[in-house]
Amino acid sequence: MSYASVVDVLTGKVAVDETVTVRGWVRTRRDSKAGISFINLHDGSCFDAIQAVVPAELPNYSNEVQKLTTGCSVAITGVVVPSQGKGQSFELQATKVHVYGWVEDPDTYPMAPKRHSMEYLREYAHLRPRTNITGAVMRVRNALSQAIHRFFHEEGYLWVSTPIITTSDCEGAGEMFRVSTLDMLNIPKTDKGEVDYSEDFFGKEAFLTVSGQLNVESYACSLSKVYTFGPTFRAENSNTSRHLSEFWMVEPELAFATLDDVAGLAEAMLKYVFKAVLEERPDDMAFFAERINSDAISRLEAIVNNDFVHMDYTDAIEILKNCDRKFEYAVEWGVDLQSEHERYLAEEHVGAPIILKNYPRDIKAFYMRQNEDGKTVAAMDVLAPGIGEIIGGSAREERLDILDQRIDEMNLPKEEYGFYRDLRRYGTVPHAGFGLGFERLVAYVTGVQNIRDVIPFPRAPKSAEF
């Protein structure tokens, strides 16, 4: 028996008059007075379902085929023929229908064939991939992740698997999930009455990582061009459409590099992956342009075909202070820009992605390289129209004395960064990198407004279902 996916049949990879079996889930079933049934079957391989024309002559027609409802899983064997209907190139003339699984109560099936709100779908995260929108999001998510790996491979980067469990805080913000096997009802204490983490599994405090950057820097300082792509965690009590407690980060690191080098890398990567998703997922992108954001395709094309605008933080502050827009958050040199400021710059002032550079040192992380003016650091953010910050990066502080000064200023425990300081003691080298929040990238490409709808099982404050 020859099996085929829906996408292979619809794109002509299966020859006309060939008999194949397609397996998937029933979207709809319609019975005609002529004694045939039309079943729309999807398997997730593409946006469209395939139509199977099922004749009443099949032995299980009355007792099974006519009882099929949305969500039932089946295998339909049939002959591939040119479709007689509109909107589809090929269909199946069924010769056999095998039912794998029934929907026990069709009246209470959560994914009934109608339009559901995104909030409703979140309650059924285990079933929402069967909907048009979540299926399309996940195919685009896959295309983007594959394109990212392909881009870095073609550029000569090595993928490094950085640890999820860590003992250091990359961002220095303290918003970390603790990893512990201590008995919460019988916590060991030190002589000072503090928690005795020497009794814990790792013999010290351990956390879920907020970033793989510090670890991947170690490998950049030996292998030159590396990146990590994996899950990260923030115990930040932000219940917004832009925040997740568990999300994926893309973090390249490049030795012998400046801020401008990684700014160019970020631009090249975004153009590469946007071009890839437009070429590989035209069906899904057409859906997003029609139903979610009419600019979904055109704005990606604009990014692919135009240069990013480079702008200094100081210049951006002057632009924001002198514009006629009333912002909720006041603008002064030294403040961290809010989403409303970033989006104004990218959407209204420039109308294109911006690489914003050279931020005040006091609002940035300890590891960012201090500029000669002593007030700013060689940091950058990539601001995209429609979402704001999508990438953050910097040149790293390779001078041990200045790095130590920053660690002390931020009251960070220097002993926890011993391995990081060693990189500056043994053959230090200028290097730079950036971090891309992968879910924000997926949200930007698809036009989906809430970041919880672009990851399979979202984790957020008071929300860890499934």
Swiss-Prot record:
It holds the Pfam family tRNA-synt_2. Its EC number is 6.1.1.22. Belongs to the class-II aminoacyl-tRNA synthetase family. It comes from the Bacteria. Its main location: cytoplasm. It is found in: Cytoplasm. This is Asparagine--tRNA ligase. Homodimer. GO terms for molecular function: asparagine-tRNA ligase activity; ATP binding; nucleic acid binding. Keywords: Aminoacyl-tRNA synthetase, ATP-binding, Cytoplasm, Ligase, Nucleotide-binding, Protein biosynthesis. PROSITE patterns: AA_TRNA_LIGASE_II. GO terms for biological process: asparaginyl-tRNA aminoacylation. It comes from Idiomarina loihiensis (strain ATCC BAA-735 / DSM 15497 / L2-TR). It catalyses: tRNA(Asn) + L-asparagine + ATP = L-asparaginyl-tRNA(Asn) + AMP + diphosphate + H(+). GO terms for cellular component: cytoplasm. PANTHER family: ASPARAGINE--TRNA LIGASE, MITOCHONDRIAL-RELATED, ASPARTYL/LYSYL-TRNA SYNTHETASE.
